Structures are given as C-alpha cells and as structure tokens.
Amino acid sequence: MSTSQTSADIQLIQRILPHRYPFLLVDKVVEIDGTTSALGIKNVTMNEPHFQGHFPGMPIMPGVTIVEAMAQTAAVMVGVTLEMADKEMKVYFMAIDKAKFRRKVIPGDVLEMRLNTLRGKPGGKVWRFGGVASVEGEMAAEVEFTAMMDMG
C-alpha cells in the first residue's frame, strides 16, 4: 500500500495534485517521511499573478497563498506515500487554525515548508497538519489546518 518514495519532482506533483498554473504552489518536495512529515519548496517569482495587485510597487506573497502552498505540500506527502499518482485525489480545507505570519515573502525568496501530520492515517478521510514556512531559516508563517482527503 505505501511506497518508499522520499521526494517528488514537479512531474510527480502534477500526477498527484489537480492544481495547475497559476495555482500550483509547490515546485518540489525534497523530503517525504511516509505520512509523518515532508519538506516542500516554492521558488517565489515575480511572474506570479498575485503580485500584480499585492501590492503594486511592493510585491508580497499573500499569507493565504503561503497557507495554500503548505496544504499542497501536505497533499503531495500523503499522495506519494499512498501511491495516488494518476488517480483521482482532491483535498479540501475544513479548518485553518493558529495562522501566524512573521515575515514578508517576496519575489526571489525560496519558501521552505515543513509539514507534520498531527492526525490522520492511510484510509482515513480527515487529516490534521501543522506546518512552518521559512525563508533562509527565518520563520515566515506557521499554521495548523484540517483537510478532507477525497481519494475518489
């Protein structure tokens, strides 16, 4: 049922997540430890549409977009471990809690997203995750969220 895959490149991510540009917000997952934890990477570029309006002349990645990138990292972790590539899998937010934003994330930053499973197991639909997003070792955001995994 589970695999020993410990990372995911963009090709594998696209085989797991239904998201596409401009809403695919994780570029690679460099560490996957089963359904326990993962480290995702988002290369932040000026080409992303949200920077047109957030904010003109001073682009800052919206906090909700950081949270979404973290959720996508968690979904990739679960999808890789449960071998969901090329299968029907959708993930829906149920709750977002304890969201805190500590520093700006701007074009040129590399956002590192460390996610941990707080509750959930293979076969279960409701999962809870905690995560920290950082840039150059400095915390940018932290959050806990609950998601429903609809695996078709």
UniProtKB/Swiss-Prot annotation:
It comes from the Bacteria. Gene3D superfamilies: Hotdog Thioesterase. The keyword Cell cycle does not apply. This is 3-hydroxyacyl-[acyl-carrier-protein] dehydratase FabZ. It catalyses: a (3R)-hydroxyacyl-[ACP] = a (2E)-enoyl-[ACP] + H2O. It is found in: Cytoplasm. The active site is at residue 54. GO terms for molecular function: (3R)-hydroxyacyl-[acyl-carrier-protein] dehydratase activity. The keyword rRNA-binding does not apply. Belongs to the thioester dehydratase family. FabZ subfamily. Its EC number is 4.2.1.59. Keywords: Cytoplasm, Lipid A biosynthesis, Lipid biosynthesis, Lipid metabolism, Lyase. One of its GO terms (biological process) is lipid A biosynthetic process.
